[in-house]
Amino acid sequence: MSHLQEEYIMFRKMRRAEKKAIPNEETIRLLQESKRGVLAVAGDDDYPYAVPVNYYYDAAAGKIYFHSSLAGHKVDAMKRNPKICFTVYGEPEIKDLDWAPYVKSVVVFGKAQPVADPEKKRAVLKTFAMKYYPNEAEADEEIELDFRAVQMIEITIEHMTGKEIQEK
């Protein structure tokens, strides 16, 4: 079975999927090309807590990775409950001279956990850094400065959908 698991009862089906769902290839491309997403966790007193994060998507493993400090609101929330929702959306696009833009988005449900193995953490952090830094030397320098002060969080995808809506 692929990392995109079959539909389970615990995840709702997308409304009007026949009109709004985008192909899996587009969903993956949006995850690979976007630079920021919004991570939502069950925060303090069960209030939702959503925060933008930089990330990278490892298509081969079917995992999403982002970096975090070692402590804080989202870290505490993920320790209490590893279930997360992660959303990425693309740039608005005008089609066929229509006035209202179309926007593609991806919504991921999964479980988050810190990358515990230091070697894996370093490898994941390097791949992450190469998405954002202009060259390997700068990425390596930043990793050496901050390696002990950051953690890499791995999201195991349990359910993922992609869709396109017209905002009108």
Segments predicted by a language model, with ranges:
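Charged, gly/pro-rich active-site loop segments
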Residues: S2-E18, E93-K168
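Short, basic/aromatic recognition patches
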Residues: F11-V38
